[in-house]
A protein has these predicted regions:
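A short core secondary-structure module
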Residues: 206, 210-229
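Short, surface-exposed charged micro-motifs
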Residues: 102, 195-199, 215
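Conserved, non-catalytic sequence blocks in retroelement Pol enzymes and Pol-derived host proteins
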Residues: 90-93, 120-121, 186-189
């Protein structure tokens, strides 16, 4: 990622209204809950020691994101639209500049941002994640869609086993992409009608899926969160 030059655009600092969220009256309580009273400060060098330290950390991350958004993602956006993705051996391949965007956000450490530090994440509150998402969306709403689907990992963190967490969360924090596989031909917003069935294969130690998913955003992702019966 290039060193920020004087007068370069920044989609965070150029839009001070985004920072308003950091001044919300409930923000201090939100940070305390997310940081569990700052217990990580004894284990991780980059963990905040108090509320003010956490806010400064968030501002730095937002500033880095604003720099990447304005000076890499936005300049790539027209090329991404013109080239578009394509099929290759049955696999959807991103436009070349989308790969550049992914490389930039990976190098900036902007993946798995809401996950705990022990898995390689930044332990950011959802408020800050939403601010990052807004900054990236200002540069390219299409790439924001790809990037923000990392939030699917929150479901696994909340409901998955520790074995699953150890297996998948570090991969997302390292920049692997995700998708949320919900929609079917006869089940869109009415998810009670989902028919795809998951059956555990004890011999192979894996789940077998029988059914159809359709219109899956970022459906070529590395990791899929699948809703099944």
């Amino acid at each position: 990622i290039p060193t920020k030059q004087k007068n370069m655009a920044n989609y965070y600092s150029d839009h001070p209204e985004i920072a308003f969220h950091l001044n919300h009256p409930l923000m201090e309580r939100i940070v305390e809950l997310k940081e569990k009273n700052y217990e990580d400060k004894a284990k991780f060098e980059d963990a905040p020691v108090d509320y003010n330290d956490a806010i400064e950390n968030y501002k730095q991350i937002l500033d880095i994101t604003g720099d990447v958004a304005a000076n890499i993602i936005e300049p790539n956006s027209e090329s991404v639209d013109l080239e578009g993705p394509h099929l290759e051996n049955g696999r959807m391949i991103y436009a070349s500049k989308t790969f550049e965007n992914l490389d930039a956000t990976r190098k900036a450490g902007l993946h798995g941002v809401s996950m705990p530090r022990r898995y390689g994440g930044l332990n950011l509150p959802n408020t800050v994640f939403s601010m990052l998402s807004e900054v990236i969306s200002a540069a390219d709403a299409g790439y924001q869609n790809i990037w923000s689907l990392q939030s699917c990992i929150d479901t696994l963190y909340e409901f998955g086993s520790e074995e699953q967490r150890q297996k998948y969360i570090p991969r997302v924090c390292a920049g692997e992409t995700m998708s949320m596989d919900l929609t079917e031909p006869d089940a869109g917003s009415d998810l009670q009608r989902v028919m795809l069935k998951a059956t555990y294969d004890e011999k192979e130690g894996c789940w077998r899926l029988n059914g159809v998913k359709r219109f899956i955003t970022n459906g070529d992702s590395d990791i899929h969160l699948v809703l099944a019966r």
